[in-house]
Every structure is written in C-alpha cells, then in structure tokens.
Amino acid sequence: MLEFKHKNTFFLFNFKQPKAQQACFFRSSFWKKQARILGSAQGRGVTWFLQTKDLFGVNAALKHYYRGGLWGKINRDYYRFSTLSNARSFAEFSLLKQLHEAGLAVPKPLGACVEKVAFGFYRADLLTEKIEHAQDLTVYLQQGKLTEQDWHKVGQLIHQLHSLQVCHTDLNAHNILVQQRDDGRKFWLIDFDKCAHQLGERWKSENLNRLHRSFMKEVTRMKIQFSEQDWQALLAGYQA
C-alpha cells in the first residue's frame, strides 16, 4: 500500500513502490495523451477503460464520483468532507480490498484519490481492475438465457458476500457482470459505493428482494430473459 498527499489531494494505491507520474493516474486526459484509452461506459458519469497491464498487471477502470437525483443537478460532484477513511473513493477502495483478499469475485482496487476543495468539500476518483470479456448481466439476458447452474453461481456469489456481513446497498441486475471464460461463465459483483458491513440477518432477505425486483423491472423495461424458475435456481444456489 502506498499513501501520500500532493498539494490538496490525497492518494492511495494498491502497490508499494512509487510509479512515474502517479499523481496523474486519475485524470482521463493523462491517459488520452498516452493513447491508453480502451473504451468507456456511460452511467451517472463516464467510466474510462485503460490499457495499464504494464503498470498494474491488469487493465483498469477509472471512475469519478457523481451525485444522482435532484441534488446532483445542483451539485454534480462535491461531497462534504468528514474523515479521509469515510471519503467515497477511500471507503470503496478499502471494502473492495477486503472482499478481494477474501476471495470474492470483485474487481481488484488499484487506487483512490480525494481532492479537497473549498468550504469543506471534496471530489473523488477510483481506479479498479477492468474485468475482461465481461458484460452487464442484463445486456447478456437480452440475448440469451443462463443455465440453472449459472443461476446457482449467482446465488452462491451473493451468499458469499452476505456471509462476510457485507450489504451491497445497490444490489441490482446491472451490478452483476457475466464473464465468458474457457471453463464457462463467471459472475462478478461491482459498484460498492456506499456499501458496508452490517450486523444481523434480516437485511439479507431484504437485499435479495431488492435484486428480485430489479430483475422483474428489466423483464418489462429491457425484455430480459428471466423467469421465476431462474429466481428459484438463484435462491437454491444462495441456500446451498
């Protein structure tokens, strides 16, 4: 782990030895100048996919934190600063590191930065591993079906997360990736912003219900191939 401050910006990296121009790693313009942009994905903001295997051993995804909802139209990306560990990017980095080291299929965190701005606010960015040959599960389900064994895998993945007492507060069908591999399909969980450890058991069934509602919503909205039989297969994997 490498942690340092440069001017008004705090940096955290998942490596020990400093790298050239590392303070520039959270600027998309830096990667564009080096012709390292592999592509992008549009969500609340743009996530940039970067060619970084020579630097990190894996390609990377760079995201800037943006606010959503009505408040996001007034204040796009400023957050009230309390402590560095509670800043959005540092908190997500820390949780991802714990989950990755526990063997959960989540992107490896590569770096985080927090830029303090005026009046006690900050802006934040996160670098994570790019999951290769993967796509949003809902996009996949627009084109084809998963097998019963695949749904078991999804359920097992969520159970593994819950067994670590971690609640994914935005557990939905879009935050599951399906990766095509030579040995079959592998499933990943992404987007752990604002997620945290949680005590007790009741929240786990509520979390699963949230996911079920998400699938049902996309049956109507995106015409994905998903049935109650698929959901029961997911639950069987979760309970196995």
UniProtKB/Swiss-Prot annotation:
Please provide, alphabetically and separated by semicolons, the GO molecular function terms listed in this UniProt record: ATP binding; kinase activity; phosphotransferase activity, alcohol group as acceptor
Which SUPFAM superfamilies does the UniProt entry name for this protein?
Protein kinase-like (PK-like)
InterPro entries found in the cross-reference section: KDO_kinase, Kinase-like_dom_sf
Catalytic activity, as annotated: an alpha-Kdo-(2->6)-lipid IVA + ATP = a 4-O-phospho-alpha-Kdo-(2->6)-lipid IVA + ADP + H(+)
Question: Pfam families from the entry?
Answer: Kdo
Q: Which residues fall in a coiled-coil region?
A: none
Gene3D superfamilies in UniProt: Transferase(Phosphotransferase) domain 1
Q: Topology relative to the membrane, per the entry?
A: Peripheral membrane protein
The keyword Iron-sulfur is annotated on this UniProt entry: no
Q: Respond yes or no to whether keyword Amino-acid biosynthesis is given for this record.
A: no
Please name the catalytic residues of this protein: D170
Q: Which UniProt keywords apply?
A: ATP-binding, Cell inner membrane, Cell membrane, Kinase, Lipopolysaccharide biosynthesis, Membrane, Nucleotide-binding, Transferase
Q: Specify where it is mainly localized.
A: membrane
Record pathway: Bacterial outer membrane biogenesis; LPS core biosynthesis
Q: Name one GO cellular component term.
A: plasma membrane
Instruction: Report the locations given in the UniProt record.
Output: Cell inner membrane
Q: Provide one Gene Ontology biological process annotation.
A: lipopolysaccharide core region biosynthetic process
Q: What does this protein do?
A: Catalyzes the ATP-dependent phosphorylation of the 3-deoxy-D-manno-octulosonic acid (Kdo) residue in Kdo-lipid IV(A) at the 4-OH position.
NCBIfam families tied to this protein: PRK01723.1
Please name the HAMAP family in this protein's record: KDO_kinase
In which family does this protein belong, per the annotation?
A: Belongs to the protein kinase superfamily. KdkA/RfaP family.
Q: Please state what the protein is called.
A: 3-deoxy-D-manno-octulosonic acid kinase
What organism does this protein naturally occur in?
Pasteurella multocida (strain Pm70)
Report the gene name: kdkA
